[in-house]
Amino acid sequence: MSGFENDISIGATMTQSQTSQGFSLQMFGKPTIVLAHLSFKGAALFFYFFANFFTNSFIVQFLVILTLLSMDFWTVKNITGRLLVGLRWWNFVDADGNNHWKFESAKDMTRFATIDRRVFWLGLVVGPAAWIFFVVTAFLTLKFEWMIVALLGALMNMANLWGYLRCRWNNTEQMTSYFQKWAFLNVLRRAQQPPQEYQNPVFSA
């Protein structure tokens, strides 16, 4: 995993006065990029859920959802990951025809606002979870054509999630070790909590 520097600055700069005014786009370090990160993802999910309100043609519905998913995939892979969290993954083919994958992270991660990073990872995780839910729902209701559409959405979202997880850790062994430690610490934390005392109900005549 090699480091890279990015001199592009898009969006407003967060100030203390802006953070004290409650929720607004200006509370983010790069509000325009945050909006781009969530807009196509949300639009694809919204149209999938309400597609029949816009058109009865499954072909049109499929093409619209596929277009939104493609725009979301490209935006997250090439823009929002680089500008919100300083991560980038890509691939190239060498002269011998071999495919090489690159997973990179910025050298100075303090340049990226904490709230921007949280929104980025939240959207990256919620997206695949929502599409997997739609896959299960379509399967249980025997709507197999919609299950295929939802499966396509899940795969495209999971591809970005996997790519950025690889950027976050040098290799799969480090990533697996991190989640194992996280699970162990959660189990240990729960085990250290004092047991709750159970009180029998008191009945009065």
From Swiss-Prot:
It comes from the Eukaryota. It is a multi-pass membrane protein. GO terms for cellular component: Golgi membrane. It holds the Pfam family DUF846. It is found in: Membrane. Belongs to the TVP23 family. This is Uncharacterized Golgi apparatus membrane protein-like protein C34D4.4. It comes from Caenorhabditis elegans.
